[in-house]
Structure formats: C-alpha cells, structure tokens
C-alpha cells in the first residue's frame, strides 16, 4: 500500500466515524429535538432574516403568494355587525341584484376564517375607497384596519 491509499482509507474511516457520532448524538437527544421542534413550530414558516418569505405548502390559502402585509386577507371585527374579511383590495363582497356589491358580514370569526381561507376562489371584492366614495365610513374603516 502506498501513502495515497492509506490517506484515503484514513479519510473514509474518519467520515464514517463522524456519521456514526452524528447518528448517535441524534439518538441520544431525540427527546430534546422533539421538544425544541414543538416549541418553535409556530415560527417554522415565518419570514426569515434573509428576506425570503417561507411558505407553508401543506395548506393552500389566499395569502400564500402575497408578501405585502397590507395585501394579505384577514378577518376583523366590523363595528356592530360581526366580522368581515379585509385587505388593501377591499372587503369580500356579496353580489346583489343588478350586480350591486356590499360587504359580506359573518356572525362569528370562525365563519369568516372558513370563508376567507377556503379552497373556493372568491373574486367578489367590494372596495369602498374608489372614487367617488373615498371619504365614506366604510373606506375609513378599511384604512383603519390596514
């Protein structure tokens, strides 16, 4: 055996030993690893320091492709009338006769969440902040929740 063969055998042996040590370390600390993951699971899909948004691809919803916070849909308490789904684009809308739109209101927060983040694509949006209604109460409310 020449010195080059011995060198590669030593490197390969060291690499295999490191793999075994890492495996044993994971085996010994598996309980701690599970506890750490459970504690920090809420931060798993948060925006990283590097600036790239991390997406939770397990569940598809309307906010997955949006990075601007004001554009993200959210359920908020509407004064005196339950809950509404809002973003910078406006409110989720109910379409009435003659294609008139009004704010879709929900009795509970869970109903609002279920409707807003369901698999159904809802393109009915009512934006009260377009001309000529810029100063109405609905527009002021929309601006206040964003």
Swiss-Prot record:
Post-translational modification as stated in the protein's UniProt record: Contains two intramolecular disulfide bonds. They are created by the viral disulfide bond formation pathway, a poxvirus-specific pathway that operates on the cytoplasmic side of the MV membranes.
Induction: Expressed in the late phase of the viral replicative cycle.
GO CC, one annotated term: viral envelope
Keywords: Disulfide bond, Fusion of virus membrane with host membrane, Late protein, Membrane, Phosphoprotein, Signal-anchor, Transmembrane, Transmembrane helix, Viral envelope protein, Viral penetration into host cytoplasm, Virion, Virus entry into host cell
Recorded superkingdom: Viruses
Key word rRNA processing present: no
Entry membrane topology: Single-pass type III membrane protein
GO terms for biological process, alphabetical: membrane fusion involved in viral entry into host cell; symbiont entry into host cell
Virion surface-side positions: 22-146
Localization of this protein: Virion membrane
Bilayer-crossing regions: 1-21
Subunit structure: Part of a stable entry-fusion complex (EFC) which is at least composed of proteins OPG143, OPG147, OPG155, OPG086, OPG094, OPG107, OPG104, and OPG099. Formation of the viral membrane is necessary for the assembly of the complex. Interacts directly with protein OPG107.
Role: Envelope protein required for virus entry into host cell and for cell-cell fusion (syncytium formation).
Similarity comment: Belongs to the orthopoxvirus OPG155 protein family.
Protein known as: Envelope protein OPG155
Species of the source: Vaccinia virus (strain Western Reserve)
């Amino acid at each position: 055996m020449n010195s080059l063969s011995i060198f590669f055998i030593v490197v390969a042996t060291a690499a295999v030993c490191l793999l075994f040590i890492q495996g044993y370390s994971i085996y010994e600390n598996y309980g701690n690893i599970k506890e750490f993951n459970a504690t920090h699971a809420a931060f798993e899909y948060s925006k990283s320091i590097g600036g790239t948004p991390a997406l939770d691809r397990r569940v598809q919803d309307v906010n997955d492709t949006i990075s601007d916070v004001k554009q993200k849909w959210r359920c908020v308490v509407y004064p005196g009338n339950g809950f509404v789904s809002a973003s910078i684009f406006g409110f989720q809308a109910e379409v009435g006769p003659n294609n008139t739109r009004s704010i879709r209101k929900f009795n509970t927060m869970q109903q609002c969440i279920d409707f807003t983040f369901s698999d159904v694509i809802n393109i009915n949006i009512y934006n009260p902040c377009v001309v000529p209604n810029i100063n109405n109460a609905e527009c002021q409310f929309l601006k206040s929740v964003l």
